[in-house]
């Protein structure tokens, strides 16, 4: 049994196309619909997203994911100046880059997923292939008590800690740790280095990505 991710804009009927879908982002339901717009338009008050109706399903998914990053930043007020005086602003190019990097989740060929595990053991982030290592025991513990892992962007490694001072780390925390480190990889490969200095920005995206992707999960025998 293997986890795969389906594109909600793919029609199950030949010669038909999906006109709209509802996706949960954070606690809110956002409606994504085809419309006569140049690219995408987001209405944060009505919580709907209009996507260019000439796009195919893959391009619609790419635009929906780009909208996801914009919406998360808006709903959580991530684009602002932080207490350390360092501004955080993801411009349109960065959003597009992040969404492109994130699209690999809908392409089976870009990651390897072991049987019955909650995260892959190899994954592409842009042109970099990251290998995930499960560490049996280390003395490291996050100051926030949540993230039990680290990533090496030179060697292309993500390390997930399986036990801490003799205590087994629960699968739910290991899964959240993977997403946390994956978001670090996203930002680094998109050259948005500020997120490496502001952990709660990474935490926010990691949590929202984990919840967002649950909507696309399906299981196949493979």
Residue ranges and their predicted role:
Residues 1-12, 18-21, 25-28, 128:
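Short, basic/low-complexity N-terminal boundary segments at the transition from targeting/disordered tails
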Residues 5, 69, 98-102, 108-119, ...:
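Intrinsic disorder/low-complexity detector
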Residues 16-50, 58, 115-124, 134-159:
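Catalytic zinc-binding patch centered on the HExxH motif and its immediate surroundings
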Residues 47-64, 155-177, 192:
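Short pre-active-site segment immediately N-terminal to the catalytic Zn-binding motif
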Residues 61-74, 176-188:
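Active-site recognition of the HExxH zinc-binding catalytic motif
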Residues 79-115, 190-222:
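Post-HExxH zinc-binding segment in Zn-dependent metallohydrolases
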């Amino acid at each position: 049994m293997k986890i795969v991710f389906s594109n909600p804009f793919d029609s199950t009927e030949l010669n038909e196309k999906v006109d709209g879908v509802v996706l949960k982002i954070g606690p809110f339901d956002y409606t994504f619909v085809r419309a006569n717009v140049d690219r995408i338009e987001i209405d944060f008050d009505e919580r709907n997203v209009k996507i260019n109706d000439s796009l195919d399903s893959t391009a619609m998914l790419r635009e929906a994911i780009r909208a996801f990053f914009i919406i998360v930043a808006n709903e959580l007020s991530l684009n602002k100046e932080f207490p350390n005086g360092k501004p955080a602003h993801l411009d349109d190019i960065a959003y597009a880059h992040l969404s492109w990097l994130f699209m690999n989740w809908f392409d089976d060929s870009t990651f390897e997923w072991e049987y019955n595990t909650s995260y892959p053991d190899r994954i592409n982030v842009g042109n970099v292939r990251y290998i995930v290592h499960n560490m049996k025991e280390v003395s490291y513990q996050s100051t926030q008590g949540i993230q039990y892992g680290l990533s090496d962007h030179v060697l292309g490694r993500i390390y997930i800690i399986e036990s801490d001072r003799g205590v087994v780390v629960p699968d739910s925390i290991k899964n959240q740790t993977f997403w946390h480190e994956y978001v670090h990889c996203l930002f680094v490969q998109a050259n948005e280095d500020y997120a490496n200095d502001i952990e709660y920005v990474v935490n926010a995206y990691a949590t929202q990505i984990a919840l967002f992707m649950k909507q696309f999960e399906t299981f196949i025998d493979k």
